[in-house]
């Protein structure tokens, strides 16, 4: 551990990583780099997987090291100052809620977090008999809560239209656009719209790359790149007409999987500054001390969560076993913990090309508990059925011993209802697991303890704080649950062979960001040129060895549309490049392999194969 830290911390953070050194994967933004800590993630057992992902999460709280590249971190003075400046502007909205609005917007995980945060802070205001003034926007609309709608994030015009619609009639709008990699066109369109109407809008960008690493390709069908938009926003900082909050939190444990660390850092950063704004509205000044106090509660959440590492590893192993046997993981949560479970389940589909039935989330009260704008969506089909009643009626009858059922609740929830549900599930499977949140002095009844073989018990200290402060414990429990689920599902799919080293190698290519990521992974694993990797990726998408001029001249949006209906696009391209074989031969090899990882591993070891960039680095 380095001994030059400015602030007192609750947890031990890792030493500075190789990723901070000049020249490390320098062509890639931090959010897309591979984390040196998890380089052999695919060879780890469940206990090691938990430890590695725990250490990656701890990087969120690292302070900057003056001896390395000067990345601003969460605890950097400049970041804390900007958080305070934004909190003061939130205060202005809170004082005039009738004419004002705080809008949180994002795509995918970021959009789901926007919903969670908007509802949390509206709930805080309602509890104080004040007017709610938070609103969320998700690319793809409310369908994106429970299904992956990633292609909609490529439309900047739609982003601007959605923003204009929700802000109609408002005179003062604080807009917070979340894009972990500083790349989402949907958010770029909204920021651009704000900067063209600065008399009403104050734009704030949240992400985890320096502006110099923002996506620089011009957005198809639009006038700018994301970087150009971010650079314009940067020029507004000194006049406080716009802000960028972009601390570096390090590469993801699973390369590029921003649902993990990026999502957690988003939650920590925004809840901290918004809570400080609410405290300050009660005549407490916005100070660095206030920000640091709240940030430390999230460090404490990390410590409490990973004190249960052994049990988290057991849950991961059980989940991997269920998935390996073509079973399922069903996550049943109470309150906002149910929404956190739904979020994790939905994100497995694009990240690991999972079937939507593999991991499913359910929430007590269904859409009524989620409080989404469009109301009950269950009529859209079984994928949209998310209440506990839906689970009992439509899913439980087919549950078997190969399935795992995970219940997530607090000891303030209806324990009689929970006990009845446990009894129903036990008739179908013995694989019942529980994540139970308690406050110090609360204990799980013996009747429940006896019926549940495996319990991850998390006990939180009593907080003697004012009303706003009581929300800290709710936020801690949500983050803790998120960390556990991220670790369990990412680890389970790693054990299933969906990860090679620490790279996602079987994700759905359903937007421009993922198309670029696929070509980047191909380059890093094979050492081939960008042009050659793009060519083979297109061969895999279209299933044609010889590409027509029409295909070559198609836009990235066209390629993404074609890729959406295909499976194993990236692994087929990887094996084809490594073996110099046809797309058809590559697909056949993958289909006959034990796992995608094993197909790539054996292709890496083909005699006479030219070593790629990642091979030489790993020696």
From Swiss-Prot:
GO terms for molecular function: carbohydrate binding; enzyme binding; fructose-6-phosphate binding; glucose sensor activity; kinase inhibitor activity. InterPro entries: GKRP_SIS_2, Glucokinase_regulatory_CS, MURQ/GCKR, SIS_dom, SIS_dom_sf. Gene3D superfamilies: 1.10.8.1080, 3.40.50.12620, Glucose-6-phosphate isomerase like protein, domain 1. Beta-D-fructose 1-phosphate binds at residues 109-110, 153, 179-181, 347, 513. Keto-D-fructose 6-phosphate binds at residues 107-109, 179-183, 347, 513. Residues 90-283, 319-498 form the SIS domain. This is Glucokinase regulatory protein. It comes from Xenopus laevis.
